[in-house]
Every structure is written in C-alpha cells, then in structure tokens.
Swiss-Prot record:
Domain of life of the organism encoding this protein: Bacteria
Any one GO CC term of the record: cytoplasm
Key words, A-Z: Cytoplasm, DNA damage, DNA recombination, DNA repair, DNA-binding, Endonuclease, Hydrolase, Magnesium, Metal-binding, Nuclease
Cofactor(s) of this protein: Mg(2+)
Job of this protein: The RuvA-RuvB-RuvC complex processes Holliday junction (HJ) DNA during genetic recombination and DNA repair. Endonuclease that resolves HJ intermediates. Cleaves cruciform DNA by making single-stranded nicks across the HJ at symmetrical positions within the homologous arms, yielding a 5'-phosphate and a 3'-hydroxyl group; requires a central core of homology in the junction. The consensus cleavage sequence is 5'-(A/T)TT(C/G)-3'. Cleavage occurs on the 3'-side of the TT dinucleotide at the point of strand exchange.
GO terms of molecular function: crossover junction DNA endonuclease activity; DNA binding; magnesium ion binding
Pfam assignment, any one: RuvC
Matching NCBIfam families: ruvC
Positions contributing to Mg(2+) 2 binding: E73
Binding-site residues for Mg(2+) 1, renumbered to this chain: D11, D147
Subcellular location: Cytoplasm
Gene transcribed to yield this protein: ruvC
Lineage: Bacteria, Pseudomonadati, Pseudomonadota, Betaproteobacteria, Neisseriales
Record-given protein name: Crossover junction endodeoxyribonuclease RuvC
Amino acid sequence: MSATVRILGIDPGSRVTGFGIIDVRGRDHFYVASGCIKTPADEPLFTADRIAVIVRHIGEVVAVYKPQQAAVEQVFVNVNPASTLMLGQARGAALAALVSHKLPVSFTEYTALQVKQAVVGKGKAAKEQVQHMVVQMLGLSGTPQADAADGLAVALTHALRNHGLAAFTKLNPSGMQVKRGRFQ
C-alpha cells in the first residue's frame, strides 16, 4: 500500500488568494479541501492588514490539514509594476506562512502557463477550462470558485510533476492520451 501524500496548492492574489488540497495515494488522487482567502476590501492595496490576513489564513489551513508538500503559482510580471509588486507581496505572505509552519516548500513554483498546460493541456486555457478540468480530474460534484480551482490546479500540477503521470491514470475521463507529459 502506498503512503498518502497531501499537497497544498496556492494561487496568490492581492484581493483573493485561492488554495486547494489534494491527497495522492498510489494511483489514486482525492479532493480534500479548497477555498478562497479574501483580504479586507476596505483596506488600501497593499497594507500590513492584507498581508496579515493571508499569513494567518494560510497558517490555519496548514495547521488544520497538515500538508506534507506545497506549491505556489509563480507571480507573472504585469504591464503595471504596482500590480506585480502587490502580487509579489501576496506570494511572499503565502510563502512566509508556509515556512513559519515548517512546511518543506523548497519554493516549488509553477507559472500559470505550466499549470494550465498540466491540467488542461493548453498553456493559454481560460479560467473556465481550468475549473472544468479540476472538476473532472477530482470527480467533484460542483464547480469550485475560480481562485480555489486555481489552487487545486497548482496542487495537481505539483502531483503530476513530482509523483509521476502513473499516479494520475484515472485523470483521463474523456479518452485523451498522454504524450510527452501532456494530455492530447
């Protein structure tokens, strides 16, 4: 019997940070939890209060669900430098929470393109396509919010990259084939 590995995926955001937790056991994968951390709308972007909310809530998620591994979506460089800086602060807050709870992150990060490629098979996939594939891959009865689905997609990407495609043989609900590590 294979050991269960619990993975936390985080999609950092200045207003909403999404998270998703999955378990990988041998050839099976299971949904554990997901959600969105919303920072106070009445606070200016980006204040210590917003950072504190992200750190506190990610810390609570880690304390409750006890993941063994974590991965974070990498911040992209935006046309607007202020937006990039705010996303970087949200990412830093999430990483600080993980490190403060002694979670071995190894700073595993994936670009949005890598996440979409791993989950949907197309790096330019729309958010709705990511949500749809997360529902299919995890056998969910409902559709998670977009940011929570992104967190789950980050966790799935980490599982695919680090626990092998063999762990995800049942990910193929539509008869797609895996070629060069991608669904075709």
